[in-house]
Design a protein with these regions (language model features):
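Loop/turn-rich, solvent-exposed surfaces of beta-rich toroidal or solenoidal domains
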Residues: 95-164, 172-173
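Short, small-residue-biased leader/transition segments that mark boundaries at the very start
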Residues: 1-5
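Short consensus segments that form the blades of beta-propeller domains
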Residues: 60-61, 118-123, 194-198
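Structural signature of eukaryotic scaffold interfaces centered on beta-propeller domains
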Residues: 31-58, 97-109, 156-164
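Beta-propeller blade signature
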Residues: 6-15, 67-72, 123-137, 197-209
C-alpha cells in the first residue's frame, strides 16, 4: 500500500488550485523522541529546517523525506523524477534522509542527515555533504570555501532562495568579522567591509548568486 503527501498550488490568475501528490510507503517523522516516565518527561528533537520546495530555473524541485524520489515540478504541471535514491529510506534503521541545497544547471548540492541523537551529550543528526555532477554523472563529498578568508572557511550551501538570481544567503556577525579582520584572516571585498565596521554594526549579509546559465 502506498501513501502520498498532498500539497496544492493556487493560480494567481484565476484562483484555481491543483493538487500535488508525492507517493511513499509510510510517513517517516524526522523527530527523535525521548521519554522518562518516572519524571513524566516527554520531548523530541528534530534536525535543522530543510527546504522541501527549491526553485530551479522555471521549475520547482520537491523533496519529501519519506520518499525515495526527488521530483521536478514544471510550469505545465508535469512532475518528473530527477533523483532516485538507494537504499530506500523506508528500509533503514535509523533512517538517513536526503535533502537538496543549491541547484545549478550542472551541480546538485545535497546533504544526508542521519536520524540519530544522543540526549546525554545533546549531539546528533550527523550530516554528509554531497555533490552530484550532472556532466560527469558522479557523486562526491565536497567542501566549498569562502575565498575572502585567508584560512579555509567553509560556506553552507543550503538553499535559502531570495529570488531567481539569489540562490541563498548567510548572515555574518559584525563582531566576528572585526575579530577576523584584526587577526588578519580576511582579504578582498570582505576585508574592505570589515574595515568599516564597529561593535554596533548590523550583521553582514553574504549573498550566493547564480551565474548566468541556461535552463538544463
Amino acid at each position: 500500500r502506498q501513501m502520498c503527501i498532498r500539497d496544492s498550488i493556487i493560480s494567481k490568475q484565476d484562483g484555481t488550485t491543483k493538487q500535488i501528490q508525492i507517493p511513499f510507503k509510510e510517513k517517516i517523522s524526522m523527530a527523535v523522541n525521548y521519554s522518562d516516565k518516572a519524571k513524566d518527561i516527554y520531548y523530541n528533537v528534530i534536525p535543522d529546517n530543510y527546504n522541501p520546495i527549491i526553485p530551479y530555473f522555471d521549475c520547482w524541485v520537491l523533496v519529501e523525506q519519506s520518499s525515495d524520489t526527488v521530483y521536478k515540478y514544471q510550469s505545465d504541471h508535469k512532475m518528473i523524477p530527477i533523483i532516485a535514491r538507494t537504499p530506500s529510506v523506508q528500509s533503514m534503521n535509523p533512517e538517513v534522509f536526503l535533502f537538496l541545497g543549491i541547484l545549478t544547471n550542472r551541480y546538485y548540492f545535497m546533504e544526508t542527515v542521519k536520524k540519530e541523537y544522543n540526549f546525554e551529550t545533546h549531539e546528533g543528526f550527523p550530516t554528509t555533504d554531497l555533490l552530484y555532477d550532472k556532466q560527469e554523472k558522479a557523486i562526491f563529498e565536497y567542501i566549498v570555501y569562502n575565498n575572502d578568508y585567508s584560512e579555509k572557511r567553509a560556506v553552507n550551501m543550503k538553499s535559502l532562495p531570495v529570488d531567481d538570481k539569489i540562490a541563498s544567503w548567510q548572515s555574518i556577525e559584525a563582531s566576528q568579522l572585526i575579530e577576523d579582520y584584526e587577526k588578519g584572516k580576511l582579504k578582498r571585498r570582505l576585508k574592505e567591509i570589515a574595515a568599516s565596521l564597529d561593535e554596533e554594526s548590523n550583521p553582514v549579509i553574504m549573498l550566493i548568486k547564480h551565474k548566468k546559465q541556461t535552463n538544463p
